A protein has these predicted regions:
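Conserved small/polar residues in nucleotide/adenosyl-binding loops
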Residues: 135-137
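Long, continuous compositionally biased terminal/linker segments
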Residues: 2-3, 48-83, 89-98
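Core segments of cupin and vicinal oxygen chelate
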Residues: 13-60
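Vicinal oxygen chelate
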Residues: 16-21, 78-124
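Short glycine-/small-residue motifs
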Residues: 129-130
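A short, surface-exposed helix-loop junction/capping segment
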Residues: 4-10
Length: 137
């Protein structure tokens, strides 16, 4: 047994430069995953559900011209675990409806048994993955 046990990831806060567009994007996407908006302010929006939470925060003014760079120090991408392939496919269908930028998928990969995923971007280009894997953690 490990010395310290954790019980999942409590939350992730994403700092965005296009707050209005990001708020609209996440307020339409996250409820599809069963997440409920519990805070919605001028500079911060926070959804809870699925044993985690996702928040978005307006960036400081001096960073408003910047965009997400996947290979810069910091977040590479955010990945949410689906319960079934159908959920990954439903995510794809919804993303098409809202005209989100889909990077790739849904498709299978050999990274892990049963790995099936879709990768897409929010309005700031932050990459989000929804996946299914037969490896249960």
């Amino acid at each position: 047994m490990s010395e310290i046990e954790i019980n999942g990831m409590a939350h992730v806060i994403l700092t965005v430069s296009r707050f209005s567009e990001a708020r609209q994007f996440y307020k339409s996407l996250l409820p599809k995953f069963g997440m409920i908006c519990v805070m919605d302010g001028e500079d911060f929006c926070y959804h809870v559900g699925g044993r985690t939470a996702i928040g978005i925060r307006r960036c400081d003014p001096e960073f408003s011209g910047e965009t997400f760079q996947q290979y810069r120090v910091g977040l590479h991408h955010l990945c949410l675990r689906a319960k079934s392939r159908i959920d990954v496919d439903r995510t794809y269908k919804f993303l098409n409806q809202i005209k989100a930028k889909i990077v790739r998928g849904p498709e299978e990969r050999d990274w892990a048994p049963g790995y099936y995923y879709i990768l897409f971007e929010d309005p700031d280009g932050i990459r989000i993955e929804v996946n299914l894997s037969l490896i249960h953690i």
